[in-house]
Amino acid sequence: MRAFDRSRAKRGEHWTGPQMSRQQFARDSFGIFAAQIAVMALGIGTSVITARTLGPSGRGLLQLLTIFPATMSNFAKLGIPVANVYCIRRRGARTSAVASNSLLLGLGLGTALALACWLGRGWLLHTVLRGVPAVTLPLVLVLLPFVVLQTFFLGILQAEQRFQEYNFQQIAPTLFGLVGMAVALLWLRAGLIGAVIVQTAVVALVTVWLVLRVHRRTPLRLAWDGPLAKEMLGFGGKSYVQTLAATLHRQIDQYMINVFLDPAQVGLYAVAVNLTNVLLKIPDATGTVLYPRLAALEEGDAHRATARVCRNTLFITAALGVGCLLFGPFGIRVLYGPRFAGAIRPMLLMLPGIVMMALYMILTRNFTSRNRQGVNIVAAGVALSVNVGLNCVLIPRWGISGAAISTAVSYSLAALMLLVVFVRESGHSVAETVLVGREEIGGYVRHARGLVPGAAGE
């Protein structure tokens, strides 16, 4: 049986321009956004528990141990998650073959990465993980194969547009994490070690569930498909540098704060980052649904869809950003207490960059869907370099506020670089891409009135 069946697209299994359903797109996006809102609410609950029980320093150490597996796993992903979507949606590859290759690659790459980190544990514990108890490192390294596998198989769910399962996989670890942290920190008083054990157990269990769900519909085989692997690695290799640079761009500031300052400052900064990143749930939700659809569209249709999604996503994100600006300081004081008041200024300083990142997250999907990852790589690489350079200057001078300024500048730069290229290649103007029209605003007003009892009939 062939790994590739390019006739699938011709039989209508792909999402084409004339068949494009805006209602279905809206439903899928809303479903993922609703799941992200649930994740946000549960995540804030977990964040409050960990912050109030561990304090700024302990919260900072937990933040480093939480983001470390996600950061390191990007060195081993090789672009496979986006390659899975591309191969299934555009190339017509059999899902079972893609999943089987992903299983073998994920286990092999994740295990090799864990061993490499263990061998370099001395350097890690004296630099980016400075202050982290050595006993917690094995618990975190065990997670690496699971984290790699999870991202590979999420790409398969995304390609098959199995968004209900995708949403459950997003919500489940946050829900289990909230319950686990409450038990470990509030009841058992297990401290940082208990929190890390909960994190490891939750990620491992959810990953096993995800693999079994994929296996149920598309049986996995311990067989290696060489030609398909070459296709996956070939496309993924182009996305690898892009994904790695983008992830480092988002997370390297927290490691640099730990190097230049101390874990307590990481804890304060983590609160600011986690609250502002709530805004990015919107472009993440729409981008997750948009990418597999763009991968099956002709270029002109893809550009039109991208411009429409960009301007609406940017509008909603900016509106919520204003809400964060007005009520965020009050929320930090009430939820986290006076010990975390130092998170307020960096939260406000990074907000403009967070809004611009919404634009970046949508535009990257357009370039990746057209096999133009080189544009994303340049933007992410330049922005990462600017971010690191600014952090080296501003963190020693202005502390975590300097890191927030660096984030705002580099995020905005990355988004503007992609916008310039998109406008040039698509023929859409800047206004068409970033500004909602009068009819679209009218639609938002009608929807808002529909949510208010008695307003719909006025």
Which residues make up each language-model segment?
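Transmembrane helical elements of multi-pass membrane transporters/channels
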Residues: 27-44, 173, 177, 195-210, ...
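Interhelical loop/hinge segments that connect adjacent transmembrane helices in multipass membrane
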Residues: 7-22, 164, 188, 192-196, ...
